[in-house]
């Protein structure tokens, strides 16, 4: 659940009754969207709003008391509002969270001194003061909006996603299990740049994980539990039982590392050492983790899993790591995404466990069981790629939306036909800017909230494709 502090702005010589009714309208909308609110009781200030130095202090103290709960702050203006009281509240609270500034519509039939809001004008003053105070803020899509309207509803959902992303990345701890595959320079990244953004990388040698896994007994309680979890997660018909048991042991070892290091996501060296020296692929385990909202990326793609984690935080749904992989006939706006795969099963129409056809020819089919294969179900999706630009010392990203079409292909692995408007322009951007071929995706529409979080609040270099 997202938690917002709420500031209702009031200016003394404007009609306070608008704040009383406006406050309740806004709170009702937030409750409808299952957003928890932190706000003083209505009788604690005039109209339950903020208009004076004393009011600002009261609200700042309330917000400080709940600072570990509050994900963001909504500033709403049922009338002109007192810009100083609003800015002082935020400064003294010291929350350092996203802020959304909203203003009510005036109605042409109620423009007398008794009912005129002037929120249209007051919003400019509030934003001017926030800028003077050095407080970063977001805006609604329309300059003024009715709380009960579809625009405000969409803006609240977008802002909640922004808040969740900013919160999620603060102190995020990500596990890198194994070195990157030697042939994949494309997944290089700067650990130091991520650290400056509050994202810590915990490394673990692949041999340490395999050491734990190989010491486990088939009858170990944790292994039995994981084995049952795998068999309940996907169809394993035709897969050797020995391979599934090996997966279970590997899963126990990985989860031990996650728990000990308090991780929120992992990236794993998935080829070819695991197959050569242990005898399975980790795809099913990674699929299960991602489906359970513990994102896991293949090929030790750390910035790839950062993108997955961002998408998951924004949407509350599983995210996957995919290759932008193929054209789709001659349609310039369609293509095919693919991985071997470790996609979360919620992405698929139907899925099953299989073997990794690409590397089976090198290491033997018997050593490559454990992929999750199928066709991605039709529906909208948001994609995101995060990358560290080491030459310029910054973190950059691109984000956009598209649609999985559900069209089927005679192919292997986990795949999906997709459509993105102006796809060729996006591909030109990816190649010109030297981005990786991996992209994260989630089956939700959350690009706007992610763009706001990364560019406005984290100050990353972000391209929004539309």
Describe every region a protein language model picked out.
Residues 69-79, 100-102, 263-269:
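Periplasmic-binding protein-like
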Residues 1-4, 36-38, 107-225, 230-234, ...:
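Cap/lid and interdomain-hinge subdomains that line or gate substrate/regulatory clefts
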Residues 88-116, 124-129, 287-300:
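Short, acidic/small-residue loops that bind anionic groups at enzyme active sites
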Residues 24, 363-466:
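Extended hydrophobic packing segments that form well-structured cores
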Residues 48-68, 82, 246-253:
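Glycine-rich, highly charged phosphate/nucleotide-binding loops
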Residues 224-314:
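Long, internal scaffold/assembly segments composed of regular secondary structure
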Residues 1-33:
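N-terminal basic/disordered segments at the start of proteins
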Residues 293-407:
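C-terminal catalytic subdomain
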């Amino acid at each position: 659940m997202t938690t917002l502090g709420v500031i209702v702005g009031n200016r003394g010589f404007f009609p306070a009754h608008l704040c009383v009714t406006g406050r309740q309208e806004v709170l009702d909308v937030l409750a409808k969207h299952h957003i928890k609110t932190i706000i003083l009781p209505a009788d604690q200030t005039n109209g339950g709003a903020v208009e004076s130095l004393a009011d600002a202090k009261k609200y700042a103290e309330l917000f400080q008391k709940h600072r570990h709960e509050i994900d963001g702050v909504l500033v709403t203006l049922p009338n002109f509002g007192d810009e100083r009281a609003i800015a002082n509240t935020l400064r003294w609270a010291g929350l350092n969270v996203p802020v959304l500034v909203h203003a009510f519509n005036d109605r042409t039939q109620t423009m007398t001194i008794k009912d005129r809001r002037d929120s249209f004008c007051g919003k400019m003053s509030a934003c001017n003061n926030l800028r003077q105070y050095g407080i970063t803020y977001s805006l609604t899509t329309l300059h003024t909006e009715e709380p009960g309207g579809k625009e405000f509803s969409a803006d609240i959902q977008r802002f909640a996603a922004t808040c969740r992303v900013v919160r999620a990345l603060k102190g995020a701890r990500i596990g890198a299990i194994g070195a990157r595959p030697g042939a994949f320079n494309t997944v290089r990244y700067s650990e130091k740049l991520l650290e400056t953004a509050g994202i810590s990388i915990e490394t673990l040698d692949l041999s340490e994980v395999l050491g734990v896994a190989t010491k486990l007994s088939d009858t170990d309680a944790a292994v039995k539990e994981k084995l049952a979890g795998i068999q309940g997660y996907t169809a394993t018909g035709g897969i050797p039982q020995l391979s599934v048991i090996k997966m279970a042991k590997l899963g126990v070892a990985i989860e031990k590392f996650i728990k000990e290091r308090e991780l929120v996501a992992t990236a794993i060296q998935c080829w070819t050492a695991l197959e050569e020296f242990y005898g399975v692929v980790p795809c099913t385990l990674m699929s299960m983790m991602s489906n359970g909202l513990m994102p896991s990326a293949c090929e030790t793609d750390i910035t790839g899993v950062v993108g997955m984690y961002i998408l998951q935080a924004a949407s509350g749904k599983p995210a996957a790591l995919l290759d932008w992989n193929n054209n789709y006939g001659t349609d310039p706006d369609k293509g095919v995404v693919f991985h071997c795969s470790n996609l979360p099963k919620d992405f698929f129409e139907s899925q099953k466990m299989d073997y990794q056809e690409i590397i089976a020819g090198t290491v033997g089919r018997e050593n490559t069981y454990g992929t999750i294969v199928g066709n991605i179900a039709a529906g909208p999706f948001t994609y995101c790629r995060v990358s560290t630009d080491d030459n310029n010392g910054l973190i950059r990203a691109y984000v956009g939306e598209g649609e999985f079409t559900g069209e089927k292909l005679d192919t292997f692995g986990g795949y999906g036909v997709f459509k993105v408007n102006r796809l060729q322009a996006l591909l030109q951007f990816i190649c010109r800017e030297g981005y990786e071929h991996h992209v994260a995706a989630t089956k939700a529409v959350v690009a706007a909230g992610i763009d706001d979080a990364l560019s406005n609040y984290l100050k990353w270099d972000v391209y929004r494709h539309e």
